[in-house]
């Protein structure tokens, strides 16, 4: 869940873990992403701990760290959008779980990758 929330948001913002943790409103956005992911897991009968705040605070130990998705983007490599975001989106659709924040994140991140590759 954490990777799905921090990877794409770091690509969209260019921010490190520490910068995202300090940014007003970012914890709320990432928390919504993780909540939606948790709802999808529950819809499939997967019991995951509801420890979103604890998971989000893990970035405080590595403030200068760039998530792997941002590292891939900056290096011009293909990002892991499909296994990290698209899969959750497809699972949500199959169970008709509303995931508006994940849908928005997917559209923005996929577009950013297409635009970068076009350059």
Labelled PLM ranges:
Residues 1-21, 25-38, 64:
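Active-site-proximal catalytic alpha-helix in oxidoreductases
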């Amino acid at each position: 869940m954490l990777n799905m929330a921090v990877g794409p948001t770091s690509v969209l913002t260019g921010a490190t873990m520490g910068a995202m943790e300090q940014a007003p409103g970012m914890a709320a956005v990432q928390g919504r992403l993780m909540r939606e992911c948790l709802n999808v897991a529950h819809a499939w009968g997967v019991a995951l701990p509801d420890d979103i705040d604890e998971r989000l605070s893990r970035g405080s130990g590595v403030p200068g760290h760039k998530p792997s998705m941002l590292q891939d983007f900056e290096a011009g490599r293909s990002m892991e959008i499909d296994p990290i975001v698209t899969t959750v989106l497809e699972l949500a659709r199959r169970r008709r779980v509303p995931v508006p924040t994940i849908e928005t994140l997917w559209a923005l991140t996929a577009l950013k990758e297409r635009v970068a590759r076009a350059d």
